[in-house]
């Protein structure tokens, strides 16, 4: 029997995909959000899902719906406040997700870094082999009736993943992030320990992460990595090229054969190894895993590429030093003979304060670095540090860019321009691409 759902904050990177899933299942779905365009709304519009502007009257007009409340909203948000006032049925986003994943064999992917890419890769492989629903943090979701698998990205921010109880979990790493909420690495590790204790069947964890190794869940734990002395699933005979990476996989002494992925950087190999591991333990055919790893084309805003004349533009969500290192490493592998230019928009003042030295160190891997002004958040509009302060710590710092002035970036030819950030870095990228396209057209 179909139901009606109303999403408060439907453009959220998790809310949007969940709305798509419920719509795909034949439910009536609508929701509200800000008017500003976001990349997550395109699939909602394509599905014909109605998007309203936040207004308390929306709650009154849809009292017959189940309201799904986005994680970003407090009780004083205009629609949340009205929903609480009149007593309609309202559930949190994690509660709504858990309701969905409880109906099938569920695999949650969690980690400070790499969870979206790994979720996307796992969803791609499984959906081509068996009926699979998935919810990815790039704004992509798909609901398949009578799914065999449900793949979900599990976010550690504010312990949102504590409500999930999946059959399996992939844990890519534990790192100190979100300093506006977590007090330190011990606090983050505690959150992951609580999540791991909810997993029913097995956990697949990166073996080089000592924080992950410190977890003691009741479920079986399989470690993946490149260390045959410590890991259960091991990638060996690794070869990296400008076309991607290929490697052999060994599970506790058993040779599972060679695999190849069109991915770049060491993190791409580890993500693929995690996908191979969980799929193998669910007895998915190895040849099918091999086949569909090769056809993976990535997820939104994770090393997304486009070519404009002689310039390669890469768009990536990297907003933590570890992620910046991984993204620039991938760019070096794929384009070893080109200049790598980093254009980075720091995300939140608290994160820049906490990681100023680490940001500077990670960005040094580029040939030249440009910064946009710090992007604040709804909870953090100002701070005591600036992008210029960060730039002063970077030896290859080229200056601060503005949306209406791309002159610093225009002299580069036959280069790789890597735009990174979790805020609105895309507006700088679009401004650059527009001007670059005009200039290159004028020269032809």
Swiss-Prot record:
ATP binds at residues 111-117. Its EC number is 6.3.2.8. This is UDP-N-acetylmuramate--L-alanine ligase. It catalyses: UDP-N-acetyl-alpha-D-muramate + L-alanine + ATP = UDP-N-acetyl-alpha-D-muramoyl-L-alanine + ADP + phosphate + H(+). PANTHER family: UDP-N-ACETYLMURAMATE--L-ALANINE LIGASE, UDP-N-ACETYLMURAMATE--L-ALANINE LIGASE-RELATED. One of its GO terms (cellular component) is cytoplasm. Belongs to the MurCDEF family. Cell wall formation. The lineage of its organism: Bacteria, Bacillati, Bacillota, Bacilli, Lactobacillales. It comes from the Bacteria. GO terms for molecular function: ATP binding; UDP-N-acetylmuramate-L-alanine ligase activity. The keyword Ligase applies. One of its GO terms (biological process) is regulation of cell shape. Pathway: Cell wall biogenesis; peptidoglycan biosynthesis.
């Amino acid at each position: 029997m179909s139901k009606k759902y109303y999403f408060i904050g439907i453009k959220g990177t998790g809310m949007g995909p969940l709305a798509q899933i419920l719509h795909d299942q034949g439910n009536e779905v609508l929701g509200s959000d800000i008017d500003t365009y976001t990349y997550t709304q395109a699939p909602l519009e394509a599905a014909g899902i109605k998007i309203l502007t936040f207004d308390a009257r929306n709650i009154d007009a849809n009292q017959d719906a189940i309201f799904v409340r986005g994680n970003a909203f407090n009780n004083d948000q205009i629609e949340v406040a009205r929903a609480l006032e009149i007593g309609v049925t309202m559930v949190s986003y994690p509660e709504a997700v858990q309701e969905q994943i409880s109906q099938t064999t569920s695999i949650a992917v969690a980690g400070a870094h790499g969870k979206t890419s790994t979720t996307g890769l796992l969803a791609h492989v499984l959906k081509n082999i068996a009926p699979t629903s998935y919810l990815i943090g790039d704004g992509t979701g798909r609901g398949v009736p009578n799914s065999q698998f449900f793949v979900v990205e599990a976010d550690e921010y504010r312990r949102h993943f504590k409500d999930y109880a999946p059959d399996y979990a992939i844990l890519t790493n534990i790192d100190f992030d979100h300093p506006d909420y977590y007090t330190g690495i011990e606090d983050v590790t505690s959150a992951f320990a609580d999540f791991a204790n909810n997993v029913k069947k097995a956990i697949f964890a990166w073996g080089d992460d000592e924080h992950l190794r410190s977890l003691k869940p009741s479920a079986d734990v399989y470690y993946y990595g490149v260390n045959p002395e410590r890991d259960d699933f091991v990638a060996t005979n690794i070869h990296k090229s400008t076309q991607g990476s290929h490697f052999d996989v060994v599970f506790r002494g058993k040779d599972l054969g060679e695999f190849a992925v069109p991915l770049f950087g060491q993190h791409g190999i580890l993500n693929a190894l995690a996908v191979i591991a969980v799929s193998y333990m669910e007895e998915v055919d190895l040849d099918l895993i091999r086949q569909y790893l090769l056809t993976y084309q990535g997820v939104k805003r994770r090393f997304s590429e486009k070519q404009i004349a002689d310039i390669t533009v890469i768009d990536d969500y990297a907003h933590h030093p570890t992620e910046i290192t991984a993204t620039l490493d991938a760019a070096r592998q794929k384009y070893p003979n080109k200049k790598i230019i980093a254009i980075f928009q720091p995300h939140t003042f608290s994160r820049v304060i906490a990681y100023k030295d680490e940001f500077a160190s990670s960005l040094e891997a580029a040939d030249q670095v440009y910064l946009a002004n710090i992007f604040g958040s709804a909870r953090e509009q100002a701070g005591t540090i600036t992008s210029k302060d960060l730039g002063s710590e970077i030896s290859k710092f080229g200056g601060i860019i503005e949306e209406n002035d791309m002159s610093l970036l225009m002299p580069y030819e036959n280069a790789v321009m890597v735009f990174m950030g979790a805020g609105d870095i895309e507006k700088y990228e679009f401004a650059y691409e527009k001007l670059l396209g005009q200039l290159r057209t004028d020269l032809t």
